[in-house]
Design a protein with these regions (language model features):
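Amphipathic alpha-helical regulatory segments at dimerization interfaces
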Residues: 129-140, 163, 188-189, 271, ...
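Short beta-strand-loop/turn "lid" adjacent to the catalytic site in phosphate-handling enzymes
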Residues: 138-162, 282, 286-294
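ATP-binding/phosphotransfer module of carbohydrate and carboxylate kinases, centering on a glycine-rich
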Residues: 1-64, 74-77, 82-106, 111, ...
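Short, solvent-exposed loop/turn elements at beta->coil junctions and helix N-caps
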Residues: 67-71
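Short glycine-aspartate micro-motif
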Residues: 80, 90-94, 147-149, 195-200, ...
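Short loop/edge segments at beta-strand edges and connector loops
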Residues: 64-66, 174-178, 323
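Glycine/GP-enriched mid-protein hinge/lid loop-to-helix segment characteristic of carbohydrate kinases
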Residues: 114-116, 122-126, 162-263, 328, ...
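N-terminal phosphate-binding loop and adjacent alpha-helix
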Residues: 113-143
Length: 358
């Protein structure tokens, strides 16, 4: 019987700080490494790296490959290290206005299984859809669950965490979806002095800023949500779609674009561009990622948006759009699924042992 508290963890969403986590993070991004590589990559001392490697080997997260030793002159041979296949998995889910995505990941962050699940009429109903999806995927895999992470756009994270912990007896991490996207960007870099800005437009506009201190999120008071678009469409006598909720319900992919609709959407793209430029200036970001259906619902508006943004931000600023919902959801799910592993990897192994899963 699990002795876990029925509550969810708050994700760290920062670069790894523990020596074991820093070494593992470096190895997750490559293949083979020797201890000297880890010293150079992490800036840690040789003794600290040696202790971290010993702990990671003991936890079954990495192993030595003496068969790959190459002669390199006098002295002790430098034995390559490699991430080991682990007998457990990490579960991540992303819940947006358009639906849920569920993924099973290994310790490298590679996707093992993936599916989608519908949103319920309320938070408890959505939780049951997620739980059913996890059970379906687990029925095909006789592998223990190290932890479960959920990234959500709605403020119902407390109930989700409690329900998932109750059902599966594994540690649960629940966090903000926009923050998880910012953390995903942060974890692809070794160091940065300039902020990374994520602007996510779904049911409302939310921004997350990532830097060396971690990730902070900020709701933005704006009139750019789906309700505003619905109002403009109605006032222009353009009937909004009724198939799905949110932006994609208002403008399904097959929506014919009349001159009146295109004019309305171009004005909206201009307003979006002004907002993106202002937020980029306010945060001093040099990397800006635009995410969510509020941006992708109108790909024909990208040029108008860019024409508004580019003259008003530093030319060195890199701006891109996450092109589709699947890419966004997978990035968020992976990041929150691996948050505990990248905070304290040895503790993940110890937790499985304590729960008699290994």
């Amino acid at each position: 019987m699990s002795t876990l508290a029925v509550s969810a963890h708050t994700p760290a969403f920062r670069r790894p700080t523990m020596p074991t986590a820093r070494c593992l993070h470096h190895m997750m991004r490559g293949h083979l490494a020797i201890r000297g590589d880890l010293v150079a990559a992490t800036g840690l001392s040789q003794p600290t790296v040696t202790r971290a490697v010993t702990s990671l080997v003991g936890a079954g997260l990495i192993h030595e490959r003496p068969d790959l030793v190459r002669a390199a002159g006098p002295g002790r041979p430098r034995i390559p290290l490699e991430m080991a296949p682990t007998p457990w998995l990490h579960i991540g889910a992303a819940i947006t206005e358009d639906g849920g995505t569920l993924g099973f990941f290994d310790t490298r962050g590679r996707i093992l299984r993936e599916t989608t699940f519908p949103l319920g009429t309320d938070t408890p109903d959505t939780a049951e859809h997620l739980i059913a999806g996890i059970h379906r995927l687990l029925s095909r895999l006789a592998v223990p669950v190290a932890d479960i992470g959920v990234a959500a756009t709605a403020p119902h994270t407390g109930f989700l965490g409690e329900r998932l912990t109750e059902e599966f007896g594994a540690p649960v991490t629940v966090g903000d979806l926009t923050a998880s996207l910012a953390a995903a960007e942060l974890l692809t870099t070794d160091a940065t002095t300039d902020p990374i800005l994520i602007i996510h437009l779904d049911r409302g506009l939310t921004l997350a800023v990532a830097n060396d201190n971690g990730v902070t999120t900020h709701p933005v008071d704006s009139d750019l949500g789906p309700e505003s678009l619905a109002r403009h469409l109605t006032n222009a006598d353009i009937l909004p779609g009724q198939k799905r909720r949110g932006f994609t319900g208002l403008l399904p992919a097959e929506t014919p674009q009349s001159p009146e609709l295109r004019l309305l959407l171009d004005e909206r793209a201009r307003e979006l561009g002004e907002t993106v430029a202002r937020l980029t200036q306010d945060t001093g970001a040099r990397t800006v990622v635009l995410a969510g259906p509020g941006f992708t619902v109108d790909p024909d508006g990208y040029r108008k948006l860019a024409a508004t943004v580019n003259p008003n931000v530093d030319k060195r600023t890199a701006i891109r759009i996450i092109p589709d919902a699947a890419t966004l959801a997978r990035a968020a799910a992976r990041t929150v699924a691996l948050d505990r592993l990248l905070s304290d990897p040895v503790a993940v192994h110890a937790g499985l042992v304590d729960r008699n899963q290994l």
